[in-house]
């Protein structure tokens, strides 16, 4: 190839744009990068050319890769997090700004300006598993060094960005690409100052070498301040021009070029001011203690997380995919160790911090929160949470996530043992209760909305929800000495009130802000710790306590602030030993149980803690109903009620009760305390919490009245799950499930889980009508009819029970099938009697109590039968749920089973039913049946009308004897469930109906047949087996057709099937077949054929089928 030969190369960038360049064939790859840098807007140092999966090496020629006329891909390298300058030319080349021609707006910053971490696409479970390093103690070594070192490095990086902006301001518009920003004397001085800072370096091979870190000296701080001064001097003339432009911007008219230059100055100066402010914030907390021994070092008075809001919630909008061009800013600042040396030089913990990219870091603290800068430098600060923040660079309110991880070693005494696994030092952080598949399904929808909003697209039906800031002021100082007078905060307009052994009322206990924020925080990961506002001059001791939650097996960390005025800090071992006042089981404890047990937060342990009254700040308009209700309650309880109960010592203070269990040994509540909060308030709270948890999944249900059936159908994408004719479990239980899912919403279910029976009370008419029609089949609701219906229903469950417990190990002497059958029969009798006979206002509450009692007894009974194996019982329940949910989305079923497994473990650990109480329900192998056998002899035939069998959605009717079919009542009659004539307490007139209809010698035969059929599960005929394998909709159609008894219809159908054609017309054949003589001959032939079949059948006995001769021989 000749030296002067040209070649065409097409370069494709990540934005799908292609550019064709004509270059010399012998050009080096390095020279080619420099040639295309001005067109693509990426400096040669950041370019990476890829062709056929290979990276083009810079020292090779372009023609060696045979790219003539081909397409090569250009990607941008991620810049190193820290840059160390070794010389002037290398520094200038590594920090050259990108071309401004690549930006759509003249003068806009480069696409990766201020991005110190560049990521591609990641998903939430992977990131969650790696967040465990953020919660480790201060002993973990990090590459960035100590907190003061991180501050200085952060300031240096920010100064580099400011210098880039200044270089663009000082350079000519047409020569910006060729400008060398680091050639100035000031920049050289800046580079020399950075050489003194030991930090991570990166060589040409990409290997990072970390030097030992230490606390920086004050001289290094002085050099950074000098660099700041030089930057301010360079910025001063542009600030003057900036003010002139803004002063005349209201009414001036501009030419095109003048307008572009002025706009460019406004953009660059504004960005520089923001960066300069961040740099000042980063270094403003550095202090030097002159009273300490030399050599003296710098320390930090507060972590960076102080400058961010304590809690920002965007309805749990979790960004899952973050494309290149966004910024992930992580601030892992810990708090001071809970020890202050005598010389006053506090030792800060070793953590990592990066540049925060949120506008919230410059916002003033909310009202009611006093800046912590008022605290003395040598006082122990309040514990601050670690903050992991993901912020979108374009539209910040759309993608905002704060995950606060409590530092286990912060703020506590030095003699506290290290945290155990799952408390503060766990290696990995998981999300209990939500499987990765379900989180991924939710996250995909949220990600699409977040990304579309970031790019300016509109999503139908999506409205940006309001952003809330939940804050809590610092707890006031109380003297918690047993028997001493407790000082309560003064009420508005009142003076401070003291009373011996005062019990702090609802406004002083169980911070509502912490419960709600922890509730949503549990959805993300560990419970969220709301930041403490203000400061206290007295020494404060914080004790981290591990509390067991009610709906999750993971242990959660709750911080118990306890203030004392003595000089000795006291550490309490657990929550129950804190001699704080008892919370009456009324307003806030009920709300604590409601919110605390929903997702397993530490609210149940917070109900007995004395904290400051919460304050809730709404940052944007649009307050939902539940937050409005919370605000109303807080305003209504500003006056702290004080009771005069006798003082209680620390040893007598009972532990906080668990959420499902009622509070025991607690102080008596004030008058009418349980009635202070109406059910409507709890409904609004639950509705708001569910809306925050589900995020975009609940966007279609703004009113909170969407039924569970509609919700599941919307998630699964199928619209026939809960239809009467759809495939499903069928039968009585399928219809009952359909009724509940169509009438209950998610809010109703949560209310029922927390003891509110109003949804059941509202469902009373539908339940009564359903049980009368589907359970008793329009029979009178007498005790005997209810008992008979219960036996019929439970007998049909025998195969299901045997199949469910076939894969687990049962006690050798226990008949688990008969145990469950008789237990369910007894419970159905009780519940059905209550539903059909109770008509007062206690219907819902009593029904809920009966269902809960039955559930606990069933769990305890089967747990005993399974030898106490909880995993076996959980697998039995989950397997049944999976079989009943074949048409539901597998992701949703997996989530339901996971949540149910966690909830079941908690319930089994708090079982109120003892093993001795359920022994009466246990049935042993070989024992004589006390209830089923006599009842099987007394039980009459099932009197279900034929039209119900044809029109119902139940499974096919099992095979019955000929006698049962013959003595079914006609379709027009009202069915009754008739008892046996030998029943001592029932009417003889009703019981004589079926026995009087047959000869007396056949009564024992029928009874024996019924008993045998109920004792042994017979194999169904082939016809029933065929029907049972059909879909429910097809099976119903088949059952509804009925037999064709007309001879003419039968022959016509046979002709159509076989394709035969009559010699005469079809009408003529029909007339001949409708003749009575032909009908008689046909019937006679049919009976003769059946008689021959019966004679050849060895299993046929005339004693078992005594009416055969009357049916097929025409005998009278």
UniProtKB/Swiss-Prot annotation:
State a GO cellular component annotated for this protein. Answer: extracellular region
Q: Where is the composition biased (Pro residues)?
A: 653-672
Chain segments carrying region Disordered: 76-114, 170-221, 329-385, 473-502, 533-589, 640-678, 1058-1080
Q: Where is the composition biased (Low complexity)?
A: 79-100, 208-219, 482-502, 535-580, 641-652
For whether the record's keyword set contains tRNA-binding, the answer is: no
Q: Does the keyword Chaperone apply?
A: yes
GO terms for molecular function, please?
misfolded protein binding; polyubiquitin modification-dependent protein binding; proteasome binding; ribosome binding
Compartments annotated for it: namely:
Cytoplasm, Cytosol; Nucleus; Secreted, Extracellular exosome
User: Which InterPro entries does the record associate with it?
Assistant: BAG6, Bag6_BAGS, Ubiquitin-like_dom, Ubiquitin-like_domsf
The UniProt entry's GO biological process terms, in alphabetical order, are: brain development; chromatin organization; endoplasmic reticulum stress-induced pre-emptive quality control; ERAD pathway; internal peptidyl-lysine acetylation; intrinsic apoptotic signaling pathway in response to DNA damage by p53 class mediator; intrinsic apoptotic signaling pathway in response to endoplasmic reticulum stress; kidney development
Give the multimer and partner information.
Component of the bag6/bat3 complex.
UniProt function note: ATP-independent molecular chaperone preventing the aggregation of misfolded and hydrophobic patches-containing proteins. Functions as part of a cytosolic protein quality control complex, the bag6/bat3 complex, which maintains these client proteins in a soluble state and participates in their proper delivery to the endoplasmic reticulum or alternatively can promote their sorting to the proteasome where they undergo degradation. The bag6/bat3 complex is involved in the post-translational delivery of tail-anchored/type II transmembrane proteins to the endoplasmic reticulum membrane. When nuclear, may also act as a component of some chromatin regulator complex.
Q: Quote the protein name from its UniProt record.
A: Large proline-rich protein bag6-B
Top-level taxonomy? Eukaryota, Metazoa, Chordata, Craniata, Vertebrata
